Regions:
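Cytosolic, long alpha-helical scaffolding segments
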Residues: 1-225
Length: 225
């Protein structure tokens, strides 16, 4: 009993980094499935990919809740517990967005996915890759923050690309699509994909929080000196 009590006050930093990395791995795997699903037009094939993505989404939920549980029972965390909470939650939101996009494709069963839709899925995958790389740097960013900051910059650039792809496509969609039902289907799917790229941007914002706080603390220490 004594050991159990005092263990809460013992540094347990390492466990959060592997859990966050595992969550980013699930995100990356989900994004790969999304990209692959865009190349298939048969309803049965789309449904099969959605099932696989749904399994990934459930695993993402499991890891996210595990991180939350660990936060509630750990006294010392590697950085602010609310930042760990928000980072995990935002990564889970991206996985949820991928799942929602795949779900809409199955439900609406649109014509072959446009090149713009495929491009958005590829950009989501690029965001997932950069998030995974950022998670690799999270444990050591205090010693060398540059790689983490570089990945955050790349995430921001990718999200801007996604905005451009989405806005151009929607403009053309309303100009050229004459089938109102098909227009609604495609717009819903594209909107969900674009929302998912936005969710990845929120991950970037939460990755930056610990770095920003460390920087401010260093500046304050300099002033105090």
């Amino acid at each position: 009993m004594k050991n159990s009590f005092f263990s809460k006050f013992t540094p347990k930093e390492p466990k959060f980094f592997p859990l966050l990395k595992q969550l980013s791995d699930v995100l990356s795997a989900s994004s790969v499935l999304l990209v692959e699903s865009m190349e298939h037009d048969l309803p049965t094939e789309r449904a099969d990919y959605y099932k696989q993505i749904k399994d990934m989404e459930r695993e993402g939920d499991r890891l996210t809740h595990l991180i939350f549980d660990e936060l509630s029972t750990t006294f010392i965390t590697p950085f602010d517990r609310e930042d760990i909470h928000d980072l995990a939650s935002c990564m889970d939101d991206v996985i949820d967005g991928i799942n929602s996009s795949a779900k809409r494709i199955v439900i609406y069963n649109p014509r072959p996915i446009s090149e713009s839709g495929k491009e958005l899925s590829r950009l989501i995958h690029e965001e997932a890759i950069n998030i995974g790389k950022a998670m690799d740097e999270l444990e050591t960013f205090r010693k060398n923050p540059k790689p983490l900051r570089d990945y955050c910059t790349q995430l921001h650039d990718i999200e801007n690309q996604a905005d451009d792809v989405y806005e151009l496509f929607i403009t053309k969609l309303f100009e050229e699509e004459k089938d109102c039902i098909e227009l609604i289907k495609i717009k819903e799917i594209m909107h969900e994909l674009e929302k998912t790229t936005d969710a990845a941007e929120h991950v970037r914002e939460n990755i930056k929080k610990p770095d920003r706080k460390v920087f401010i603390k260093a500046e304050q220490d300099t002033w105090n000196y």
